[in-house]
């Protein structure tokens, strides 16, 4: 009986604990500041090409790019290109940062009817892809990963902003 109860409790914890933490965090976002970080490669031409591709994808969905404003979308790309070994590795991380208020300060400002000025920068969305590729296909595979992450972001953005589909 005791083992059965433990199994039921653990099952319920797993079922309820798998919800996405970033649900509805992208609601109302129409302007973003793009930050692109490439670590491990010194290829400025490829970097500019990828940034242009990302900006064009945002224009396709009518998301405007602005300078020095929150929310900020960050593409962090870490590449370990090994010409000696057969495989090279990469990590592509897409994160969205926005201002937030701690729960304590939020409730305190409700009680005081004053708007708090203690804003924090918080990660409101994040997804990443870790992959391996040959050196010949490394750029192509990193670009495919960027495109997959962008598509995942847009899917979540449409879920949070359903009226933007029309």
Locate each region found by the language model.
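Extended rod-forming repeat segments used as scaffolds/tethers
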Residues: 9-10, 62
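Generic N-terminal leader/processing signal
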Residues: 1, 16, 62-63
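A structural "domain/chain start" motif
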Residues: 4, 14-56, 155-166
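Sec-dependent signal peptide hydrophobic core
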Residues: 2-9
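C-terminal/domain-edge helix-coil "capping" segments
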Residues: 19-24, 105-166
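A short, hydrophobic beta-strand-centered structural micro-motif
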Residues: 31-35, 56-98
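Long, continuous compositionally biased terminal/linker segments
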Residues: 76-126
